[in-house]
Amino acid sequence: VPFMKKMEEQNMDVDFIPIHHYWNWYADEGAQAFLDLVDETWKMYHKPIWITEFAISGDPGKTKFQRKVVMRYMKKVIAGLDKRDYVERYAWFSFSPTDYKNGGSGLLNHYEGKITDLGYLYQKLGMPKGYDRNNPVKAKANPKEDVIKKYYITVK
């Protein structure tokens, strides 16, 4: 909040509010708590929300039960995000399925180059409102100095 207060004091604004969050591996309570966090963030700022990273953490995903819990969490959260007009973007953070702590959240097996069952589910579930499959974002490299000159601002 101090950052936002400084922005306001200098008559500046932001275009959106980013959220980056991970819940533990319980699905139902965690999914609702995450959606509540999104709602509270909206109520606080009344700005579009971009969820830069979300997933379940603390889950080795080594059992069939745990993988089902992760899938249930993903389904519930994405359905909830898609119902909220103020959520413009979201991205599941994909750990590798071989990651000791967070493997149950992996969308891609990096070693085999194969999409996981969770990856296929994510692909099917929906798209953030701001994403257009027909108009993918193309990144363009900028020299560091040009970026600094163009976008640097001082917040006192």
Across the structure, where does each feature detected by a protein language model lie?
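Well-ordered, non-membrane alpha-helical segments in soluble/globular domains
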Residues: V1-F3, Q32-D36, R67-V77
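Aromatic- and acid-rich polysaccharide-binding/catalytic face
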Residues: P2-E40, M44-P60, E88, W92-F95
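Aromatic-rich peripheral "rim/lid" segments of glycoside hydrolase catalytic domains that contact
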Residues: D59-K64, K68, R72, K76, ...
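Short, solvent-exposed mixed-charge patches
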Residues: V155-K156
